[in-house]
């Protein structure tokens, strides 16, 4: 008979950012614990509010499954004498396992023969095991920061005040710190600050809502979404979509309600991004726009309580926002007094990184790289690229960015517009930070893209040069994001750039800063880029296709991506599997790089040799032309016509003939075949 397991951990307010990860961990931990304990179970679901983490598991078996347990003992030669009688070691092992020596069995392992005992272990009632599992689960939930409280020897995100632990409606007894598990939960801190008993999960949800708590974040999110759209419409505007803020406020409240507030229209002279950022980042307010997308002087905030007179709450919110926007207006007015060009020199006093110098030094390095990219791809843009690179970090020393770091680049663009700087240059100042996240918006202009590539490349090469290499989950300089940004820009824009050349130029600019050998840094950076590229491509294409292409070419990212896409399409052909098998045989016999050796038709001894040689010459020219045009699908289609001749060759020809001259000629023939696809993919890596 299956039963329901329910756990609630009641706490002081946990930071919103901690909760989604904690929920995922709870689900993973309980699955692992129940699996390890041989306890069958059904659906697992975690929930969270700022003051509670809850977990429900359905269809939990009432009893642990039986199992056969094998205990390994000493080696056979240690456990038994030559005459088969047990030694003292054998007797001791048997005694420790509670069996007679005659019950010992022999198990053959990689290390030799060992004695063992196989015993049937009868499952015990689940409830007894849960008393150990649940406190261990609570203790194993990890947080970015945890704390101790009182003189207790436990840690959690915030002090724990109550624990509900039920199995089939019965308390699972255990303690965590000084808290004993029980049946009593608590309501909303301000609207229903009382305890209430819980019978099961359904009863828990009902009682929570009666006590002004909505435990399920998905339900809270939909309530908030519905409410903010309703309030926005009532206020005569539309909500500016912000899924990130919606996710955040979902975990800030237990019982959400939305209210509308306003601010003075005089603040609309401040760039909209600053207003939006101030409301979102500092106050957690949603912004409002009109039907044309123009920012309105209003906001929506989510309260954690219902109030009889919302105006009191609104006035408080408006007062706080007015102070923030007044600061923004002051910084904006002051910053406009100093041209961006005049601020560049101040970057010499801004430390970028202790071993890599100032922000001014960094700017000089990536400006040269950006100019080089422009020279190679669009020489006519070089002057504007140089200007954009020079100015793109200047807003770091403005008052506005000092107060609102999130608007770096954006303010540089706005000040550039106000100062009459070329619009392309102004936009590039903001664009050079893009993309700011995986799958994020890319620079729209080539000027912005060139500067973005250069800045990110200098960051990566600089950090690798001084040993600041990402490890595990630690990536303080966001180098993985920077590498993916470069890759996405180059591939999306179709830029014909050689990655090896870019990295070499970036490292050359870092002379005098390197604390490692340049050759080692170069190799590490290229491996780093390749890893990110492979990860990115395997999200869209089969892993074996990506590996096969990257194995033969990686320097030109656009070209490599085109080959991967072509091979992925080619692999979907119904005849691909036997085709791949045939070409894998070629690759496996002719290993290593293709060596051009002439094929002598006079040394052919079998008809299949001549047939394959003629087939090769019939397509070689077309394949070469299609490869030159980067029409790799057409090239592969031509190569595929050789399958019959290749199969006939392997069926009728012994490649490794005893006669060295004949053998080498046959190998040379296979080298020709391999040479057709050597620059597209290594078919040996294809999973046929």
Swiss-Prot record:
InterPro entries documented for this protein: DALR_anticod-bd, Gly-tRNA-synth_bsu, Gly-tRNA-synth_heterodimer
Subunit composition and interactions: Tetramer of two alpha and two beta subunits.
Entry's localization field: Cytoplasm
Family, per entry: Belongs to the class-II aminoacyl-tRNA synthetase family.
Entry EC no(s): 6.1.1.14
Pfam assignment, any one: tRNA_synt_2f
PANTHER family: GLYCINE--TRNA LIGASE, CHLOROPLASTIC_MITOCHONDRIAL 2, GLYCYL-TRNA SYNTHETASE
One of the record's GO molecular function terms: arginine-tRNA ligase activity
Principal location class: cytoplasm
NCBIfam families listed in its UniProt record: glyS
Record-given protein name: Glycine--tRNA ligase beta subunit
